């Protein structure tokens, strides 16, 4: 039955060690890039709309290069003996570190953190080929859909959480235009 297949996927050690952190990485990136980046740059960093637009363009271009580049690079490196899971973990670590830099307001007008965010934002999708090698061939679509559902649930939770914190904090009137 379908329930049995999903339980087999979720109980797999590789799934429950890799999928949650990958889903969290994807969800945090989707949340920041899709909803909160513009507001953060305006309200926290105090950037103009022109400066914001340039940074959002940088994120979009870096995301495109990151998606293609990480896929090609992990394939190349895995042929040289580099473990795909370690590559994934390194990319996720970079993604989470740059998010900490945003939270701590480190170099708020810089470009480098937006480049790193874009390059590593979609790195969580590299979990799919890793996991698909651990299941029977018919399980891959269910594994991918389980991660996708988890990711989008986390997106909504993170969006709500950030919004809630910002509502408690309130706007900084000194940054108003």
Placement of each model-derived feature along the sequence:
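C-terminal transmembrane helical hairpin of 12-TM major facilitator-type secondary transporters
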Residues: 82-127
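Hydrophobic residues within alpha-helical transmembrane segments
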Residues: 20, 54, 58-61, 90-97, ...
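Extracytoplasmic gate region of multi-pass secondary transporters
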Residues: 12-71, 121-128, 132, 155-163
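Transmembrane helix-loop junction
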Residues: 39-44, 75-76, 103, 133-134, ...
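Helix-to-loop junctions at the C-terminal end of transmembrane segments
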Residues: 67-82, 166-167
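Flexible cytoplasmic inter-helical loops of multi-pass small-molecule transporters
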Residues: 1-7
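A late C-terminal transmembrane helix in Major Facilitator Superfamily
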Residues: 67, 134-171
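Residues that define the loop-to-transmembrane-helix transition and helix capping
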Residues: 16, 50, 85-86, 108, ...
């Amino acid at each position: 039955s379908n329930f049995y297949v999903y339980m087999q996927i979720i109980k797999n050690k590789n799934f429950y060690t890799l999928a949650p952190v990958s889903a969290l990485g994807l969800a945090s990136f989707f949340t920041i890039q899709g909803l909160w980046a513009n507001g953060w740059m305006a309200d926290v960093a105090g950037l103009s709309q022109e400066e914001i637009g340039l940074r959002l363009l940088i994120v979009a271009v870096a995301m495109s290069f990151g998606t293609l580049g990480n896929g090609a690079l992990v394939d190349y490196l895995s042929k040289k003996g580099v473990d795909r899971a370690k590559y994934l973990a390194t990319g996720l670590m970079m993604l989470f570190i740059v998010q900490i830099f945003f939270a701590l307001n480190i170099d708020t007008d810089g470009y480098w953190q937006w480049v790193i965010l874009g390059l590593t934002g979609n790195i969580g999708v590299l979990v799919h080929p890793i996991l698909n090698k651990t299941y029977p061939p018919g399980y891959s679509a269910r594994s991918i859909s389980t991660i996708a559902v988890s990711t989008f649930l986390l997106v909504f939770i993170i969006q709500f959480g950030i919004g809630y914190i910002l509502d408690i904090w309130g706007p900084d009137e000194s940054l108003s235009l």
